[in-house]
Amino acid sequence: MAEQMVFDADQVTAEVAEGIEKIQNASNLEELKAIKTTYAGADSAMTKASKAIGSLPADQKKEAGKLMGKLRADFGRAYGPKEVELKEAAEKAALAAETVDMTLPVNRKPLGARHPLPKLMEDVEDFFISMGWQISSGLEIEAEWYNFDSLNFGPDHPARQMQDTFYVKGNQAKDAAGFVGSNMVVRTQTSSDQVRALLTRGVPLYIASPGRVFRTDELDATHTPVFHQCEALAVDKHLTMADLKGVLDKLAVAMFGPEAKTRLRPSYFPFTEPSAELDLWFPDKKGGPGWLEWGGCGMVNPNVLKSAGIDPDVYTGFAFGVGMERTLLLRSDINDMHDLVEGDVRFAEQFVMGE
């Protein structure tokens, strides 16, 4: 037997008021939805009262309908804004929970550091570029003709034995005249780029050739079998030793400061005539200001110009070479060549602030 529904205006009004009060006090969406189910769901007093209107006398139905419409509207006006409020609060809480606290300490990944040697070589290149010279890298595996013969080293010249050259087994190359028969070597000096550059670029020529060279030295505090040089070559009309000295002085100032200066001492190199040892003076030398040997230089030997098909009666030139490792040792506190080749990042980090 179906339950008889009775319309009780006071009871339904009280229950709706109770539901509205609970809506106002709800603290989360789950609680709010439960209140809606209790006070506006299928089994709620409001729903039952609405159904009971049909059993009322005709003269009471109109007033009962108005009352139920008002109660539903009151309940909805309380529920809607509260639902929006609690949804916004839930979204803010979720965003706050996902926020990264930037003040928390993090595990930083260690940073590397540039090795001081390539940085020094860039500084040297920048110096020559600032004067309008070109940079020529040359070849590390080179024809013996370019490394020795074209530079006025005779077949039995003592320098060939003294430098203990690495020869590349089973390979031969063409010399400048196109004749096959020149052995391939791992270059012992960046001077090997001189005649090749003259042949390919022509004159006038102003180049700097920084790069690696290779000799059979044992690695110790002052030697390494792989090291770096920078060779500079200028060939033009009317060049003299005065031009050479001017460039050397400017390079010394660029590398060692405004008080640095150079001097030349007579020497001998097959590819220059006259030749000179290049000495450097600068105030920050270890042990106090003084002179140190820095490199070699001289006027290009006429035989070298002839190797490139250039008339030495028309053109003259000068050349000089300095060791990059030696330059770095002179202008820093490095005392052992091992530090330059062992790849310890702690060593490179010492030079970061100077970049």
Swiss-Prot record:
The keyword tRNA processing does not apply. SUPFAM superfamilies: Class II aaRS and biotin synthetases (SSF55681), tRNA-binding arm (SSF46589). The keyword Thylakoid does not apply. InterPro entries: aa-tRNA-synth_II, aa-tRNA-synth_II/BPL/LPL, Phe-tRNA-synth_IIc_asu, Phe-tRNA_ligase_II_N, Phe_tRNA_ligase_alpha1_bac, Phenylalanyl-tRNA_Synthase, tRNA-bd_arm. Binds 2 magnesium ions per tetramer. Gene3D superfamilies: Bira Bifunctional Protein, Domain 2. One of its GO terms (cellular component) is cytoplasm. GO terms for molecular function: ATP binding; magnesium ion binding; phenylalanine-tRNA ligase activity; tRNA binding. Its cofactor is Mg(2+). It comes from the Bacteria. Keywords: Aminoacyl-tRNA synthetase, ATP-binding, Cytoplasm, Ligase, Magnesium, Metal-binding, Nucleotide-binding, Protein biosynthesis. Its EC number is 6.1.1.20. GO terms for biological process: phenylalanyl-tRNA aminoacylation. It catalyses: tRNA(Phe) + L-phenylalanine + ATP = L-phenylalanyl-tRNA(Phe) + AMP + diphosphate + H(+). Belongs to the class-II aminoacyl-tRNA synthetase family. Phe-tRNA synthetase alpha subunit type 1 subfamily. Tetramer of two alpha and two beta subunits. PANTHER family: PHENYLALANINE--TRNA LIGASE, MITOCHONDRIAL, PHENYLALANYL-TRNA SYNTHETASE. This is Phenylalanine--tRNA ligase alpha subunit. It comes from Bifidobacterium longum subsp. infantis (strain ATCC 15697 / DSM 20088 / JCM 1222 / NCTC 11817 / S12).
